[in-house]
Amino acid sequence: MQIWEAKWVKSLFNEYALFFISLCVLFWWLGTGSLTWKRISIPLFIGGYYLWKAEVYRFIRRIPLAALLPIAAALYTMFTPGYLFADIRNGYEILSVYLIGIMAILLLQDRYFISMLFLPIALSVTYIGFMVGIFSKPLVSCDERLVLFLKHPNILGAVSAIALLFLITYCNKWKGISRYILSGMGCLITLILILSANRAAYLATFVSLSFLIFYLSKKRIVPIVITVIICIVTIFVLPQEQLDRVVSSVESPLNDRTFETRKPIWEAAIAGIESAPWFGNSIRAFKAFHHNYIMENAEDLNSRYREVEKTVYHPHNIFIGLLFMYGIVGTTLFIWSVGLALKKALAQKDLFFQVVIIFYSVFGLFEFSLDREDGIVLLFFPMGLVYGREIAASLQRQPPAQHDQPCGAQAE
């Protein structure tokens, strides 16, 4: 018996509305900087209730073993062998978001993307509220950089960049007048990204958009024109101080002040990797480890670097950060999970997950976001979608169906 012919499936798709609403709210919370582990639990429990009520556990033996890899990575994070249970909250969020992604496919099928629209909607609404004077400037800006309600401009830069990539990747879903409305929203999100003055997000978005546009566009002049337009807009809308930062990073990246401050941070993280190479230290331990390291080596560090930051919460590099957090064992498990998901995304023609990986691979050269809800949701929810299709296909005894063909791509 194929699972979609089973009785529980017929009731399932008549009862998904509450899960859909909770998923919309989750992305709204993400866009307004108010997402917490407790709020992540809401769609998890609602979706879990629907699946349990439908007796989906009867088919658990059909689930591909590969889909269990991210769960193993989440449990490893929760357990944190190098520093017992230090990252239990991060691990819980990874597990929850991944399972929510799977549930989105099983419960909503190809309608899950509508809930993701609430991320760019939330960003747009809060920015418009700032522009019309509902929110004061000190509330949503920091050092002439836009923050909105996301606590730091670097967080806003990453979130707005992924929101923009989502709108572009799924643009074939928008029909009629909604296509024009969402195109306007995309322009607004681009402006928000520019005003965040997050140079790492700029670079990662440029690389990701280049991949997207060259993949989708037959006219190679298009990406050149778009790049020129964005550069011109950036020059006119960025405050002079932030524009100088961007120009400095282009003209002399190795002498840039921010790059200089990253060096002692990376040095401390590498020392942490050497102290616990196999099982890691946990990301929660980094602040204390970094502080102790710079205190113990203050004279040497001050002689070699122009500036040494006293308080740092993460390693500012995802590759170094993973080894510090997980060690060799956990990093291998993490990369295995992501790599296999990427392979399956290529087979499914899921362009969004591919772009997310490209973005975080570049963004991660200078930032580490897996210690925050935004980084966890924007990586592990799309991963859950990829494995969710594998699970759905396994339950149907059919090859994976592509539910989110990117704009301009043709179904085979």
Regions found by a protein language model. Name each.
Residues 35, 85-89, 144, 148-153, ...:
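Membrane-interface catalytic loops of GT-C/OST-like multi-pass glycosylation enzymes that act
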Residues 17-24, 313, 343-366, 376, ...:
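Loop-to-helix entry and N-terminal half of a specific, functionally important transmembrane alpha helix
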